[in-house]
């Protein structure tokens, strides 16, 4: 399951225990739409990870706060601490590795 994130729930989401992944995207972003089903598959195959999606048009303040300059961009957190930020996309195998490595 992918949680829709905005300024009301973003901080509590990333502060959750365990690994959380916030994807920054936009409805108009073609690469974001292409990888959406892949992200859903990865989320379903990795139930210990929590996935969330931030629409940069609706929540531009969050994107600015974290320095998101392009989309899709993924921020990976562990227990509320930012581990890494990446805009790497590619095959499902590559994206799974990038998003799930600790």
Language-model features and meaning:
Residues 9, 58-62, 94:
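Short acidic active-site motifs
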Residues 29-32:
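Short cysteine clusters
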Residues 60, 66-75:
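Structural micro-motif
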Residues 76-102:
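Non-catalytic, surface beta->alpha helical segment in thiol-disulfide oxidoreductase systems
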Residues 4-5, 24, 36-43, 47-61:
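Thiol-based oxidoreductase modules, predominantly thioredoxin-like and allied folds used
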Residues 15-27:
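Short active-site neighborhood of thiol/selenol oxidoreductases, capturing the structured segment around
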């Amino acid at each position: 399951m992918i949680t829709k994130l905005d300024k009301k729930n973003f901080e509590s989401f990333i502060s959750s225990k365990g690994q959380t992944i916030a994807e920054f995207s936009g409805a108009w972003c073609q690469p974001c739409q292409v990888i959406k089903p892949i992200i859903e598959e990865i989320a379903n195959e990795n139930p210990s990870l929590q996935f969330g999606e931030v629409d940069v048009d609706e929540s531009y303040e969050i994107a600015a706060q974290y320095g998101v300059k392009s989309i899709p961009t993924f921020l990976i957190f562990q227990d509320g601490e930012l581990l890494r930020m990446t805009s790497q996309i590619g095959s499902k195998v590559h994206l799974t590795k990038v998003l799930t490595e600790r």
